[in-house]
Regions:
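Glycine-rich phosphate-binding loop of ATP-dependent small-molecule kinases
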Residues: 1-210
Length: 210
């Protein structure tokens, strides 16, 4: 099954992608990872991407989708895949269609903005070892101190409320139109907000079996 995961930053896409991959034995493919791999391997599209990255420019959609097509041609995608973080825009979604990449279902993890702000601004990361915590549901034993190495836990710039709101604004403007795009094509399944990871997974699996 060829899947796309949509949802605002902090909606839990990465977590659900990992679970679906394990259950269905298919790879999760994210834009950042395939870009880095293509550049490292020196593929035709990777070299094109590198020329833009070296110039400090955004990598154009056609190059990103070209790299995606290279990745989807690999053996581990024979039984399906999950796209996480691509497409980000209508232009990318149209490019995926034009390139003949078949998409079976699009899952949108629907989480309210205020829940996402609370979820992300509560994250803490150890400066030394990178261990992650949360001030509500995954507290360190001593506030501000890492359980594993005793390092200081801090809030990353990406998780500060003002930054989270900026990222949500960008998501609503650029990526949210994809919900309507895939709904029109009869491929969209909206996953309602659930308080736990397990409940969300149950809703995801129900949508995939429908």
């Amino acid at each position: 099954m060829n899947l796309i995961l949509l949802g605002a930053p902090g909606a839990g896409k990465g977590t659900q992608a990992e679970i679906i991959c394990a259950k269905m034995n298919i790879p999760s493919i994210s834009t950042g990872n395939i870009l880095r791999a293509a550049v490292k391997e020196g593929t035709e599209m990777g070299l094109k991407a590198k020329s833009f990255m070296d110039a400090g420019a955004l990598v154009p959609d056609e190059v990103i989708i070209g790299i995606l097509k290279e990745r989807l041609a690999q053996d581990d995608c024979a039984n399906g895949f999950i796209l996480d973080g691509v497409p980000r825009t209508i232009a990318q979604a149209e490019a995926i269609e034009t390139m003949g990449i078949r998409i079976d279902k699009v899952l949108e993890l629907s989480v309210a903005d205020d829940v996402i702000v609370e979820r992300m601004s509560g994250r803490r990361v150890c400066e030394k070892c990178g261990a992650s915590y949360h001030i509500i549901n995954k507290k360190s034993k001593v506030e501000g101190v890492c359980d594993l190495c005793g390092g200081k836990t801090v809030i990353r710039k990406d998780d500060q409320p003002a930054t989270v709101l900026d990222r949500l604004k960008a998501y609503h403007e650029q990526t949210e139109p994809l919900v309507a795009f895939y709904r029109e094509r009869g491929k969209l399944a909206v996953i309602p907000f659930c308080p736990s990871i397990e409940e969300t997974t149950a809703e995801v699996m129900k949508a995939l079996e429908a």
